[in-house]
């Protein structure tokens, strides 16, 4: 038997049927799916050095299980004391099984470790069916060693779906188990 991540198995066995039932799709191909998860972490340029960049890349790589890359600034910005070609952020794009494994760890391990957690914001959709989740501290992931962590950066996690409507994407992420805020738990 082949290995299948838990959210992927859940999607194939239960979520597709629930989405077809709720939105009356005529074909299985119309059912929205999670295409990719993009994790982006901005780096403070004022404390920039190669060691900071390498530590941040190693941390994101440990969290996601996939090598992260850094993004360079495209032009000089004197207001930010930024030179062209300076690394300003780190990103990693997750697809297929690695994406589902990260989603499982995020929902079941990392988000419950957030202090005073009541759910994620349900209004962070972009109008095209994509959801953005901001995390202020990376130490919620158990892969991060807090003793050796010098700079604690936050990150932005973008869930890209094949849906063009926020309502469908929200229901898809809800069925995956993403805990949205409700009036009861606020």
From Swiss-Prot:
Subunit-structure text: Part of the 50S ribosomal subunit; part of the 5S rRNA/L5/L18/L25 subcomplex. Contacts the 5S rRNA and the P site tRNA. Forms a bridge to the 30S subunit in the 70S ribosome.
GO cellular component labels: ribonucleoprotein complex; ribosome
UniProt protein name: Large ribosomal subunit protein uL5
GO molecular function terms noted in the UniProt entry: rRNA binding; structural constituent of ribosome; tRNA binding
Domain of life of the native organism: Bacteria
InterPro entries: Ribosomal_uL5, Ribosomal_uL5_bac-type, Ribosomal_uL5_C, Ribosomal_uL5_dom_sf, Ribosomal_uL5_N
Alphabetized HAMAP family for the sequence: Ribosomal_uL5_B (MF_01333_B)
Keyword Repeat annotated: no
Functional description taken from the UniProt entry: This is one of the proteins that bind and probably mediate the attachment of the 5S RNA into the large ribosomal subunit, where it forms part of the central protuberance. In the 70S ribosome it contacts protein S13 of the 30S subunit (bridge B1b), connecting the 2 subunits; this bridge is implicated in subunit movement. Contacts the P site tRNA; the 5S rRNA and some of its associated proteins might help stabilize positioning of ribosome-bound tRNAs.
């Amino acid at each position: 038997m082949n290995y299948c991540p838990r959210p992927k198995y859940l999607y194939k066995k239960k979520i597709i049927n629930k989405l077809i039932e709720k939105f009356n799709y005529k074909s299985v191909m119309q059912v929205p799916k999670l295409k990719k998860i993009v994790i982006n972490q901005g780096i403070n340029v004022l404390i920039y050095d190669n060691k900071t960049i390498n530590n941040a890349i190693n941390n994101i790589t440990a969290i996601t299980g996939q090598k992260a890359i850094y993004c360079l600034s495209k032009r000089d910005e004197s207001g930010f004391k930024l030179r062209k070609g300076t690394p300003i952020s780190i990103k990693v794009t997750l697809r297929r099984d690695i994406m589902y494994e990260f989603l499982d760890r995020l929902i079941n391990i990392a988000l419950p470790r957030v202090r005073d957690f009541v759910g994620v914001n349900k209004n962070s959709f972009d109008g095209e069916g994509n959801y953005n989740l901001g995390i202020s501290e990376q130490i919620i992931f158990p892969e991060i060693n807090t003793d050796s962590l010098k700079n604690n950066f936050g990150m932005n996690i973008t869930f890209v779906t094949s849906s063009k409507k926020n309502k469908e994407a929200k229901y898809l992420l809800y069925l995956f188990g993403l805990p949205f805020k409700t009036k009861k738990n606020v």
